[in-house]
Structures are given as structure tokens and as C-alpha cells.
Amino acid sequence: MQNIKAENSERFMKKNYRCRIIFSSLSLILLFIACWIYVSNRSTDMVIYDWLSIDVNNQLFCFLRNTEIEFPDWVLYNLPDALWLLSFLFMNEAIWGKDNRKYIFVAVVTIFALSIEILQMFTLFPGTGDMLDIISYVIVLIIYLINNFLFYCYEKFSKN
């Protein structure tokens, strides 16, 4: 009996480790894509560059901006925000796994992102408030929650 418990525990740890690697890798890939879209297509006089002390004449920065690809507006202006939120949610998943306390962070970060957009709409925070950003945040949250539900339901029923 003890042997079976140890074997199941070891299998769980390996599976859990793989899930954490997958979620953290996806998070980093999404973060990179969002940053690339943002840096390569947005104006160099944005406040974010001052906040982060980014030299817009840096060679790497100039290299990233040298793209001839034309994207639709929603890709340039809404997709990076959605990818940043999804990146956070996936990294949160990698860190917390099955622990339900992760939903506290999901709620706080999602509410924060939505609040910033709403404050921007009323010019109470610098930036351009955009309803498509709000919609993209809600879509990302729904995708994340459905993914969690399906993933854990599959895992639960595949044991039987």
C-alpha cells in the first residue's frame, strides 16, 4: 500500500512539474510576442519608455522596430494588452498550480487591468482608454477560466 502511494505521488510530481514548465514557457513566449508587437509598432515618444528608462536609439530597440509587416489595428493596440494579461495568468498557473489561492491573484490583476482602462476612458489615468482592451481582458479571463475548468475536469476524470 505504501509503495502505491509513493508511486502515485512520484507520478503526480512529474506531471505537475511538466504542467508548470508548459505554463511558464507559454507565459514567457506570450510576453515576448506582446513586447515585440508593442515595441516594433508603437510611437517612441510614449511614457512607458521614460518609465522604464529605455533608450529608443539603442541598437536592439532599432532592430526590433525594423519590421515591414503591417498588422491590423487590433493586433497593434489591443492584442499586446491581452497577451500580457494571459502571460500573467499562465505564470500564475505555473506558480500556484491547483491551489485555489491563485484566483485571488487572477481577480486582483484582472480588476487592476480593467480599472486602468476605465480610468483612462475618463482621463483620470494617462493613456487611451479603449473598450476593445476591456473586451480583450474579459475574453482572456474567460479563456483562462474555461481552460482551467476543462484541464482539471479532464485530469480528475482521467484518473478513474
Language model: regions and residue ranges:
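Bulky hydrophobic segments
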Residues: 2-160
